[in-house]
């Protein structure tokens, strides 16, 4: 089955589900203490599929540490994480600094199988380095180890390396 824009297959897929009712419930936690942050989210989609009540849960937990001393800003009134502001912006000239460097790790798990829904289970472990050049630009380097278990298929594993450049304005 084709996946994203480049045609790579999805690890998990339920196909189109004809459900009569569904609800999504989730909770998110964030803790920040100086350069260290912990974040987690859990969600479950509950649905009525072919007369059966089904639950499709997912969860992630991640930790990050800014090697250069920055912190992850949090706006309590809005309940949002704001952009990271490096102590020194990255620059090629003598006035430029090294930007902000963060090491991070993440665990995620998704279960798309319940009763007659056979979408499979996926577990990911991620290690990454985030390099914030300035408040609007960052590079993300990730290594991801994924383990998929889909009914009727042998368990599969894959290792991925990713690089993403992000500009936020």
Q: Predicted regions: what is each one?
A:
Residues 1-169:
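Outer-membrane beta-barrel pore domains
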């Amino acid at each position: 089955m084709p996946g994203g824009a480049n045609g790579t297959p999805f690890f998990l897929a339920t196909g189109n589900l004809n459900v009569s009712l569904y609800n999504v419930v989730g909770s998110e936690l964030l803790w920040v203490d100086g350069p260290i942050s912990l974040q987690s989210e859990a969600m479950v989609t509950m649905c009525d599929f072919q007369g059966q009540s089904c639950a499709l849960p997912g969860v992630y937990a991640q930790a990050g540490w800014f090697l250069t001393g920055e912190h992850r800003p949090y706006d309590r009134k809005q309940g949002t994480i704001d952009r990271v502001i490096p102590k020194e912006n990255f620059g090629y000239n003598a006035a430029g600094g090294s930007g902000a460097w963060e090491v991070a790790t993440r665990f995620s798990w998704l279960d798309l199988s319940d009763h007659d829904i056979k979408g499979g289970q996926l577990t990911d472990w991620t290690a990454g380095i985030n390099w914030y050049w300035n408040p609007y630009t960052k590079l993300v380097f990730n290594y991801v180890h994924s383990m998929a278990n889909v009914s009727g298929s042998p368990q599969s594993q894959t290792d991925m390396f990713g690089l993403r450049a992000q500009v936020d304005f």
